[in-house]
């Protein structure tokens, strides 16, 4: 049974339960470190790789993350017991996709797990985990950050599982619990690890087809701001096997490798 930290009303993660869930499946990825409070689980993973660069796959998860980062160095924190802060270090050679497609491949794996709990789980290009709220609006429930460290890829996954309304970082965010999705953090962590182990092996056309079905970006008029702060407007038509968003603009088709997407209201 998970112990409660007297300073916090929510239970701590139970490492034995995570390992038990992994053992019930066919996953070979069972090296997982569970910690209390961290600045960032990615930082813990990087430190281990610096000490042991030849290590195979391992994961780090924490009850509380106080200085996590999302894409473009945006802050991503996780209050004690209220979310999933998970980093998985994977040898880059295990991925069947190009490096630029890794965030999308990870998104497919995570969203596959969320779809077992709710039909309202979606992916927003390039790396946001979205939920269709009871109101019909889309809200962000999580995100993915991918970092390269030597011969490994560190996959950082953050999900708001049990945040209350007052704990949400913005009005455009939500948590699974607020949308009526109750689940065990331990079970979801184990499912994500096991699903990702399979998904990294998918051929590009396989994960891409799944991504197209899960996307809430495609088919909409969007405005994309790329890393050079240039703005493009067009119809989000598809994604390529390299992870690029394919836009149909007034000037023709354009592939965007990275950027921020906002839906254009009509």
Region spans (language model):
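Short loop/edge segments at beta-strand edges and connector loops
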Residues: 36, 123-125
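N-terminal lobe of the biotin/lipoate ligase/transferase fold
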Residues: 1-116, 135-136
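Long, positively charged amphipathic alpha-helical accessory segments at protein N-termini or as interdomain linkers
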Residues: 2-11, 17, 94-96, 100-121, ...
């Amino acid at each position: 049974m998970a112990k409660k930290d007297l300073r916090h009303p929510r239970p701590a993660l139970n490492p034995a339960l995570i390992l038990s869930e992994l053992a019930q499946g066919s996953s070979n990825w069972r090296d997982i470190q569970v910690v209390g409070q961290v600045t960032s689980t990615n930082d813990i993973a990087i430190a281990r790789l610096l000490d042991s660069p030849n290590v195979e796959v391992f994961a780090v998860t924490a009850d509380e993350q106080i200085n996590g980062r999302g894409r473009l160095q945006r802050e991503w924190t996780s209050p004690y017991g209220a979310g999933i802060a998970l980093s998985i270090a994977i040898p880059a050679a295990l991925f069947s996709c190009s490096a630029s497609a890794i965030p999308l491949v990870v998104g497919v794996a995570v969203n596959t797990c969320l779809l077992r709990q709710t039909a309202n789980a979606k992916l927003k290009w390039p790396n946001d985990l979205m939920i269709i709220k009871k109101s019909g609006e889309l809200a962000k429930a999580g995100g993915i950050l991918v970092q390269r460290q030597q011969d490994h890829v560190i996959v950082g996954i953050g999900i708001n599982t049990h945040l209350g309304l007052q704990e949400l970082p913005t009005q455009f965010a939500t948590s699974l619990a607020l949308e009526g999705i109750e689940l065990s953090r331990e079970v979801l962590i184990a499912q994500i690890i096991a699903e990702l182990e399979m998904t990294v092996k998918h051929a590009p056309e396989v994960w891409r087809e799944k991504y197209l079905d899960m996307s809430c970006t495609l088919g909409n008029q969007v405005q994309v701001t790329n890393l050079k702060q240039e703005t493009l407007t067009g119809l989000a038509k598809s994604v390529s096997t390299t992870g690029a968003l394919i836009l149909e603009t007034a000037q023709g088709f354009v592939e965007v490798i990275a950027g921020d997407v906002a839906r254009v209201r009509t």
